[in-house]
């Protein structure tokens, strides 16, 4: 199926992508109803997509998917919440068939916001079929728990004290359609934050676990569309269409779009930004389902809202005409925190990633580890700094870190056409260690100055700089490392335009 980017309505464009995905899933489905690569919930969301799009055309695929789900062994990793949600979106699926598939499988209910919200929404969907007052009370208590544990206006934690724009977007998308007014009020506040994160560049998902992945992008697209943020939604949809043109599908990682290898995973350089639980067919079916929902519910644009107040929040967003920078200031894992800001240079759909999200899978072999974090390290490469605390005062972020028992500090100041990064520590070591996206051409003009000619950006330091090209990865793929070697202090100014101060 050919795909052309045209100035048609978002509903039509979303429908076209959903149809593309539906056809691809039909081709990828095996005779037994499963998919080529192991998946957790692809059959359920694929069946929902097919049943809503064209139940007659895809009848054999729908039946095969349901039969596969009936035959599936319910292991401890059985994604009950996701499978149930997909099944409940299939028009006309009888309760007997639903129960035959789910059987007595327990819910996972991890201490993660999106799973908790999904479980609550599933319970709401079951209430429509005549559940009693006890379940309504349980849902009310569950919502109180979710708000207390995960909601910190205007954002949802992923896990307590950890932010992920991907799973924030999923929570907002789920609550947007809730029949409960209290849920929709929270969804509106959460979506306003997504509008700020997305801007006009179309990258809605750059902070925290799952950065860059299609899962968060389609959820953000749905919530933004439903709430009338059409400028932001249009830019996200453009990114999805562009990725589809480049790869012929919707890749799992939209900030590293490429053909799917036979062995995708977190350790494969061809699939950067993946986690051990990521599955191409899960995310493809999930994306198709949300895109079709967008096509089915067109909305009118709304006036720009009042920007969310982030003064006390754990994330920081700095937007100027030259760039947008995003930071997450708390968390427990490498992918939670941003010791170097995620920076987008320029505006609109021509925006370029300068500094991509860093960190990644930690519970399985992966491309990521302590060495891949953009913080100082000892000159021999044996020890790497760890963040102790991050805080923000107006346009300045301070990060306290410890390296081989020695305390140090990074200060990042954001101005209209300049970002200044200063590292200080009471020992000679390798400072900065910033990871510049591989698409950015970087030229060393003097020992203390670098130039990105295509972006009009100059890196000016008061110490010597080195460009290290060897085997570094961000969530967007390979990167060049900028290092101030063997020093105890460095100030780097990243300047847009012709500022020679």
Positions of PLM-derived features:
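Aromatic-lined, polymer-binding surfaces characteristic
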Residues: 3, 23-186, 198-201, 208-222
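Short amphipathic alpha-helical segments that mediate assembly, nucleic-acid/protein binding
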Residues: 18, 59-62, 95-98, 233, ...
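Beta-strand-rich recognition/accessory modules
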Residues: 449, 458-501
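Extreme N-terminal leader/anchor segments
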Residues: 2-15, 19, 23
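Type-3 copper protein
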Residues: 188-191
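Extended polysaccharide-engagement surfaces of secreted carbohydrate-active enzymes
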Residues: 2, 196-469
């Amino acid at each position: 199926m050919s795909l052309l980017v045209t100035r048609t309505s978002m509903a039509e464009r979303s429908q076209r992508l959903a149809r593309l995905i539906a056809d691809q899933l039909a081709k990828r489905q095996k005779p037994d109803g499963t998919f080529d690569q192991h998946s957790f919930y692809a059959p359920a969301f694929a069946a929902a997509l097919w049943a809503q799009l064209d139940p007659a055309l895809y009848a054999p695929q729908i039946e095969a998917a349901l039969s596969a789900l009936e035959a599936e062994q319910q292991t401890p990793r059985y994604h009950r919440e996701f499978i149930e949600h997909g099944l409940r979106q299939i028009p006309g699926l009888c309760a007997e068939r639903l129960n035959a598939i789910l059987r007595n499988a327990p819910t996972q209910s991890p201490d993660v916001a999106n799973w908790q919200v999904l479980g609550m929404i599933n319970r709401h969907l079951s209430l429509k079929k005549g559940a009693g007052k006890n379940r309504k009370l349980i849902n009310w208590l569950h919502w109180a728990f979710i708000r207390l544990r995960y909601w910190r206006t205007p954002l949802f934690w992923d896990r307590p004290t950890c932010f992920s724009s991907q799973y924030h977007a999923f929570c907002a998308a789920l609550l947007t359609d809730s029949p409960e007014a209290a849920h929709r009020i929270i969804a509106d506040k959460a979506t306003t934050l997504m509008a700020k994160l997305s801007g006009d560049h179309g990258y809605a998902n750059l902070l925290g676990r799952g950065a860059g992945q299609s899962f968060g992008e389609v959820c953000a697209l749905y919530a933004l569309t439903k709430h009338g943020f059409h400028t932001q939604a249009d830019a996200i949809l453009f990114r999805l269409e562009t990725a589809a043109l480049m790869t012929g599908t919707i890749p799992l990682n939209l900030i590293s779009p490429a053909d799917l290898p036979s062995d995708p995973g977190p350790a494969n350089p061809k699939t950067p930004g993946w986690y051990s639980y990521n599955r191409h067919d899960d995310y493809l079916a999930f994306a198709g389902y949300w895109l079709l929902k967008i096509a089915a519910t067109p909305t009118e644009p709304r006036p720009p809202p009042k920007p969310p107040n982030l003064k006390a929040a754990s994330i920081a967003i700095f937007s100027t005409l030259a760039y947008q920078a995003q930071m997450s200031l708390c968390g427990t894992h490498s992918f939670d925190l941003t010791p170097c800001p995620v920076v987008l240079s320029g505006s609109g759909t021509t925006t370029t990633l300068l500094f991509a999200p860093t960190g990644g899978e930690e519970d399985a072999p992966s491309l990521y580890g302590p060495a891949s974090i953009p913080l100082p390290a000892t000159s021999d490469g044996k020890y790497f700094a760890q963040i102790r605390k991050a805080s923000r005062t107006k346009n300045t972020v301070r990060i306290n870190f410890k390296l081989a028992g020695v305390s140090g500090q990074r200060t990042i100041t954001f101005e209209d056409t300049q970002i200044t990064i200063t590292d200080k520590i009471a020992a000679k070591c390798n400072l900065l260690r910033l990871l510049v996206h591989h698409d950015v051409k970087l030229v060393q003009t003097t020992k203390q100055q670098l130039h990105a000619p295509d972006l009009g950006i100059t890196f000016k330091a008061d110490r010597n700089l080195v460009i290290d090209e060897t085997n570094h990865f961000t969530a967007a793929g390979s990167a060049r490392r900028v290092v101030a070697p063997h020093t105890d202090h460095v100030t780097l100014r990243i300047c847009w335009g012709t500022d020679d101060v």
